[in-house]
Regions:
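Aromatic pocket-lining residues of Rossmann-like dinucleotide-binding sites
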Residues: 22-26
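N-terminal FAD-binding dinucleotide-binding subdomain shared by FAD-dependent oxidases/monooxygenases
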Residues: 1-8, 15, 20, 30-365
Length: 365
């Protein structure tokens, strides 16, 4: 049942992706909305729009080419304005200011995740990254009436190192008279009271509090299943000192246990990744059955090599330059590791093919 916030005093804690979606809607309903922000988010207009029937027909005719491009692309995202787009070939610093801005404007108008791959080095070079970051901050300032509020909503960390959040009417919410931004770095939350929340030295009278404080990415859901491996070892205990895996699909000590779209998997189109990993696992099982074997698990040394490669790739990017869930920073006590494979899908596929060539990185019985 949809909650009714009409004439209610509401607080939303958190301005990540979930908070942004909630705030956009609740701002239009609540009598008063307090937005409790610790870290501002880079946002991009979602640009949802009706699909023209002619465009749908065109895309279906190009479907084979689209999938081929996606399977050979770094991230699996190859559309701009819902049409096929070539992969980037240049640094953001190799083009003129005018050409760079035109590219950013084009992708901003496209919406969604289009800016991720405008140039080859947006996540590798800080100077290149900051050209996009300042462009995004300009877009934020242009939509906020109060310049003080606008600056509080402008992130300063490298763009794309935290999730880029598509939105509709989010920034405009802060122009409404019933919406108040509370900067938790200036006035932190102290406690709940019977009437609401105390932030700084002020008590906010509230009818409802909505927590949009994120979740334990990649490992959290698997931890909660209480998966147990050899010697009754739990997966949560196995990963308590840092994430380990081989090929982002299995881990030593848990024979015949596979996952898809999980820890250490590529930052890639999740539909195509699930398809590839399912095929890999099914082919592996078929080969094992043909050889009359019924157990497989990674060898410790093979797993260590994959983990090291994953972390080395992650450390070569800008992701470690901010606190983010890609590195596990949003969960207190979680070891800081690269949780995703950031080396692109073609290189990941090469690792999988090498592993399957002779199974030398696995214990097979």
């Amino acid at each position: 049942q949809k909650p009714n916030f009409e004439n209610k005093q509401v607080a939303v804690v958190g301005t990540g992706s979930s908070g942004i979606q909630v705030i956009s809607q609740v701002a239009e309903e609540a009598g008063k909305l307090y937005v409790l922000q610790r870290t501002p988010a880079y946002t991009i207009p979602l640009q949802n729009r009706p699909v023209d029937p002619g465009h749908a027909t065109k895309m279906k005719a190009q479907y084979a080419e689209l999938r081929e491009r996606q399977r050979n692309s770094f991230s699996g995202f190859t559309l701009v304005h819902s049409d096929l787009a070539p992969p980037p070939t240049q640094s953001a610093l190799e083009v003129s200011d005018e050409a760079r801005r035109a590219e950013y404007e084009n992708r901003w108008a496209s919406g969604g995740l289009s800016p991720y791959y405008a140039f080859t080095d947006s996540l590798l070079n800080m100077e290149s990254n900051q050209t996009l970051a300042e462009f995004a901050r300009e877009k934020i300032r242009a939509r906020i009436d109060d310049p003080v509020i606008a600056e509080k909503l402008c992130p300063q960390y490298p763009i794309l190192t935290r999730r880029l959040s598509p939105e509709t009417r989010y920034l405009e919410a802060f122009n409404r008279p019933n919406v108040e931004l509370v900067d938790l770095l200036e006035t932190p939350i102290h406690r709940f009271t019977e009437q609401g929340l105390v932030v700084g030295d002020t008590e906010l009278p509230l009818d409802a509090v909505i927590f949009a404080t994120g979740f334990d990415v990649m490992t959290g859901a698997m931890d909660r299943i209480d998966i147990r491996g050899r010697d009754n070892l739990t997966l949560k205990t196995r990963w308590s000192e840092g994430l380990t895996s081989h090929l982002g699909m299995m881990t030593e000590g848990f024979p015949n246990f596979f996952w898809i779209n999980g820890p250490h998997s590529p930052f890639y189109n999740p539909i195509l990744l699930a398809e590839y990993q399912c095929d890999f696992i099914c082919d592996l099982i078929t080969d094992l059955k043909a050889d009359n074997t019924d157990l497989i698990e990674p060898l410790p040394e093979a797993e260590a090599q994959y983990v090291q490669l994953t972390n080395d790739i992650g450390n070569s990017t800008l992701y470690p330059q901010s606190d983010n869930y890609y590195m596990g920073d949003n969960i207190e006590g979680k070891p800081r590791n690269t949780l995703f494979w950031f080396g692109g899908f073609p290189f990941y596929r090469k690792q999988c093919r090498l592993a399957r060539a002779d199974w030398s990185g696995f214990r097979v019985e």
